[in-house]
Amino acid sequence: MISREMEIKIPSGLDPSTIALFIQIASQYDSSVYVEVKNKKVNAKSIMGMMSLKLQKGEDVTIVADGQDEDAAVSGVATFLGA
């Protein structure tokens, strides 16, 4: 299991269309991928879970992945959120 702390840099934050793209990226990986913010941890492949976070630009999150391609998963998801 690996994790990376980062700041969301997407100008619009994670609106529904951005979340849909995010889930497509997270779903490319076999590893379990989670997003943690404050005391909440959600499955990064769940549209309802991700929408419940209401993430905005400038928020700090932790990306966690566990599985055979965990390094690639964290890197891919973090790259998207840091765009």
Task: Locate the predicted segments by residue.
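Intrinsic-disorder/low-complexity, polar/charged segments enriched in Ser/Thr/Lys/Arg/Asp/Glu/Gln
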Residues: 1-5, 60-62
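Aromatic-residue detector
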Residues: 2, 22, 29, 78-80
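Compact, glycine-rich, soluble single-domain proteins
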Residues: 7-43, 48-53
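C-terminal structural segments of small proteins and small subunits
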Residues: 51-83
